[in-house]
Amino acid sequence: MSKFGFYSEKASITFESHLVGIEEKTRELLLNLRAFIISLGDNVIEEPRPHRIAYAKSLNFRVFADVQPKDDSLKISVRKNRTEALVTCVVSNLSELEKAKSQISEAYHKIK
């Protein structure tokens, strides 16, 4: 069973499987973003799913960031709490990534 309890282990989806078939610059953005999100705290949970990678702070608040790798960009969705609308952006360069990191950090620190 996965960390969130949605998928069985036999699905065997890994973070690395999301690196296959995307452009090098997108791969670098994704690796940079992953390192940043994991560095936010010891309680960050990474859950690779078939078409995206979900990040949660705990099992109580399911997901604060979703990253969907595309060929030439990353589609990032951020949820700051259960009542606010999901904020989605498309990132294709470092300056856009820095803006997304700011929103992700805010979401991580805002949720309890």
Language-model features and meaning:
Residues 1-112:
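Charge-dense, helix-prone N-terminal extensions
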